[in-house]
Design a protein with these regions (language model features):
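Beta-propeller domains with acidic blade repeats across secreted/periplasmic ectodomains
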Residues: 1-98, 109, 113, 117-120
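Long, ordered, helix-rich scaffold segments
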Residues: 63-68, 77-293
Length: 293
């Protein structure tokens, strides 16, 4: 599927990862810290409903601010932890070059913090170093951080994006498809990415392709529907663009023999396409659609 599916772990089928008998416990966020452990943000309130959702006669006994000074952060450490000392972060005093090197850190917190600080500083003297990091790093996560640092410093170009579109890591290709939307020179590579072996990459490439106004994308959108049209998500991805919800797309499908074999999902597509064209309410498109009905 082109989307994430959350599932309980095998050891958590009959228990919660984190629970409390305290009815004020309101876990609101989860993150990885600089030490690699999990940190849970507990907003800790007696009530989380707003007064607007509570009948007026019940509000008289309710203090909606109760607990607003009692929020806390929990640090969750595995029982197997050996208590190994960890490096206390001080990235605010790091040189820009050191921040670039930190994009290769094994811990997500260090990498994302280094990326944020690089973008805040906007020291463009390190752009060559970041480009080299993207080209030479063996870690796809580091290559991805480098890409977005370049994007945030307005140093991204079509050559780099084309390389990212062909990256061996699916996650890098998926993000490269988003970045390719700004570069017409990447259109051909982006079109080919709609046939990627990774459904998530193919899905994002389909969405990104719709940002272009070039009618040459229509045959590729039609091919995507032929391959993945059974999925409502792929149909929505195609229909989300102007050209992907046009009579020209309908003509391309007809020409390819799309309607030769009747299938329920194809009926759904025709209905969704007609509804989208109708909602857009462009007279020329409506006229052309009715002529083909």
């Amino acid at each position: 599927a082109p989307y994430m599916v959350a599932k309980r772990g095998a050891q958590e089928k009959d228990k919660e990862f984190l629970a409390s008998t305290d009815t004020w416990f309101r876990p609101a966020g989860l993150s990885v810290g600089p030490d690699g452990h999990l940190y849970v943000i507990d907003m800790y309130r007696q009530h989380i409903e707003t007064p607007l959702s509570i009948p007026a006669d019940l509000q008289t006994d309710m203090d909606f601010d109760a607990g607003n000074t009692m929020g806390r952060i929990y640090r969750i450490v595995p029982q197997s932890s050996t208590g190994v000392k960890w490096e206390k972060p001080n990235l605010k005093d790091a040189t820009t070059e050191q921040l670039v090197n930190t994009l290769s850190h094994k811990n997500k917190w260090w990498r994302t913090t280094a990326q944020r600080l690089l973008l805040e500083r906007q020291d463009k003297t390190v752009i060559p170093q970041v480009k080299q990091l993207f080209a030479q790093s063996n870690d796809p996560r580091t290559r991805l951080h480098a890409l977005y640092v370049l994007e945030g410093m307005d140093a991204l170009d079509a050559t780099i994006v084309k390389a990212a579109l062909k990256d061996p890591a699916a996650g890098v290709r998926e993000n490269a498809a988003i970045l390719a939307e700004r570069f017409p020179a990447c259109l051909n590579d982006l079109q080919r990415l709609t046939e990627d072996s990774s459904l998530r990459v193919s899905y994002q490439a389909t969405l990104s392709l719709g940002e272009f106004k070039d009618k040459n994308i229509i045959p590729w959108l039609a091919k995507t529907l032929q391959a993945h049209g059974q999925s409502k998500w792929f149909r929505a991805a195609v229909l989300s663009s102007e050209l992907g919800s046009s009579v020209d797309l309908l003509d391309a499908l007809t020409k390819s023999g799309f309607a030769d074999k009747a299938e329920d999902w194809k009926k759904d597509l025709y209905k969704e396409l007609a509804e989208t064209i109708g909602a857009r309410n462009q007279k020329s498109q409506l006229k052309d659609l009715l002529q083909r009905a």
